[in-house]
């Protein structure tokens, strides 16, 4: 595995020398089997907004929660909610008229107070000794997710329980926005391409794939960075150029792109996915051993 690029939410890395089945298994695990925390139950005490209770609950469930799932245990239907298996949030907000608004104003931002309900209004309510033991400030990943809009007198008062789950059970538990891979492009120039043809060849590929260099006073094309190519196949529209280039892919070189929802850093997601895959392999070997003993 070679790390290519990483920032707060995205990671690009290469996996070399593996089979397509392993690469796809790894992608599917990232999408559906790395656990996260998400809103599972919503207790509606008061909701006089235009948003129906079930729609409100659905919107709350899809808000990514910044909480490390490794700190929690899975909760079954029979288990009671406690500090080990549940995170609790409260959303209580009421819209009112602004007394400072100008009489001729028509801007809701000036006329009303709390007329837009955002994810930042969700407050963590610690259960048991969570505040002391976990040393964390659990919150929504993004503060600016719009949940509902209110008018004076309307109110939302709900209590939310977040539990640990995986994307296989519900998409709200998926820790990634996208997880994909592609084979490394392989571009070979079958013969020298010079002059005006070299310039046109460069325009047939993504920026940075083909570069022009001066050799003995002539412009000559060369492959600079094949991994930047998006396989647009533009080259095949040019009859005089298409036979000068061979396009292929390296069959055991996979370029992975992972974009986190922000719940966990992308490098942590990759390491957790590897652990899940190793656990699956170990369970399979144990099953084989048990069959052989029989």
State where each predicted segment sits.
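Protein-protein interaction/assembly regions in multi-subunit complexes
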Residues: 1-294
